[in-house]
Amino acid sequence: MARALMFQGTGSDVGKSLLVAGLARAFADRGLKVRPFKPQNMSNNAAVTADGGEIGRAQALQARAARVPLSVHMNPVLLKPQSEVGAQVVVQGRVVGSAKAAAYQQMKAGLLPSVLESFRRLKTEADLVLVEGAGSASEVNLRANDIANMGFARAADVPVVLIGDIDRGGVIASLVGTKTVLDPADAAMIQGFIVNRFRGDPALFGSGMDLIAGHTGWAALGLVPFYTGAARLPAEDALGVAGPQAPKPGAKVRIAVPILPHVANFDDLDPLDAEPGLEVRRIRPSDVLPTDTDLVLLIGSKATIADLAALRAGGLHHDIQAFARRGGRVLGLCGGYQMMGEHLSDPDGVEGPPGSTEGLGLLKVGTVMTGEKRLVAVTGTSRLGAPFSGYEMHIGATEGADTARPFAELDGAGAEGAVSADGRIMGTYVHGLFGDDRQRAALMGLLGAGPAQVAYEAGVEEALDGLAAHLSAHLDLDRLLSLAR
């Protein structure tokens, strides 16, 4: 049976996901059968598994790095936020309901058996299971019934490596402080630490590594320099998705993307960001739509009606509607497609409080939210004339006159999506479209951006190989492997 090693962090966004991905590729290159595992993830960025389940996108990237198919057991509990205090709960790939934060804390203990079952199943397939924790290991206020960090590590008897991020500052305090606040039995699970995202001369932090080791008693397992190739990998969470974007002076086409509170599957933007000829501008609902916009792209949402209300509250809906009236192009993906219709209805409160609302009125369609979720990989040919591969992940059924002009013909499934009579307004439920080089090239041709210059999926593979080489150069893989049990 496989050995396992868990990577926890001093906080969120310290690089746990990419470290696990890079190590998965590095150990797979050594001939080991590797499986990634994250007991609990919180993300609206999800991937579809072959059996019609869903897991966090970070675990999908890690599975790709390990060169193995996706499995719902790689992320047995996925929380998909629907509000500031509540989330949809997905267990072993299937939606089991929604829960407020306080109720979920009581629910967690009942989920541990499913988590351990998934972990055991992966161990039967692998030589090595690389486990990723969630958030911070030091959130001791949430320790009761924990399944994401030390609660899992102790239940499954998996040794832990703690990761700190020096790029954000305070890494010595964060690592030493974690040891200070942890229960002694939890702290004893930690076998060593890694300092991640270092910039500058490593010799200058040698004494820092010694200080941390001296205060904690943990082994110093490595100082990992900042990996610039990470920008070529899919976004792992929403932190920074609405952050400032550097202008692209050579870009011929500018795409405006409203970033709404419950944005989902935002990695649809990554392939577009990678193209030198496209400038993808994230804008807030309170912003004015830039006058030089060539395309408005409305992306996915975990709470479509609530996000449409946020768009209206900021006033940006007026600009989008005026842009469309002037002949501007608008494309909606999944939740964005639903917003573009004449009305949305959620009679059973699937995404939030029961109710209905007017849509943006850009397409002659309407959507009714239903409890049944469609999770499937798809292939087909779009109205842009190019074939594609992608996936659907949505609730809701959309019907109306404009569906007579579908956005795509899906192989084995028929017509999908809707297009306005003038062809300038389009909506589809398909995610992952623009990760397909053929479809991205077709969009760029339509917008006058020139030919596509990026082989996106090949670039992801190159970045994973580069990450594996980077970690191999700065970490002792044999020592890490010796810690696993």
Curated annotation (Swiss-Prot):
Residues 252-439 form the GATase cobBQ-type domain. Signal peptide: none annotated. Belongs to the CobB/CobQ family. CobQ subfamily. The gene is cobQ. Keywords: Cobalamin biosynthesis, Glutamine amidotransferase. The keyword Amino-acid biosynthesis does not apply. The active site is at C334 (nucleophile), H431. One of its GO terms (molecular function) is ABC-type vitamin B12 transporter activity. This is Cobyric acid synthase. InterPro entries: Class_I_gatase-like (IPR029062), CobQ/CobB/MinD/ParA_Nub-bd_dom (IPR002586), CobQ_GATase1 (IPR033949), CobQ_synth (IPR004459), GATase_3 (IPR011698), P-loop_NTPase (IPR027417). Catalyzes amidations at positions B, D, E, and G on adenosylcobyrinic A,C-diamide. NH(2) groups are provided by glutamine, and one molecule of ATP is hydrogenolyzed for each amidation. It comes from the Bacteria. Pathway: Cofactor biosynthesis; adenosylcobalamin biosynthesis. NCBIfam families: cobQ (TIGR00313), PRK00784.1 (NF001989). GO terms for biological process: cobalamin biosynthetic process. Gene3D superfamilies: 3.40.50.880, P-loop containing nucleotide triphosphate hydrolases.
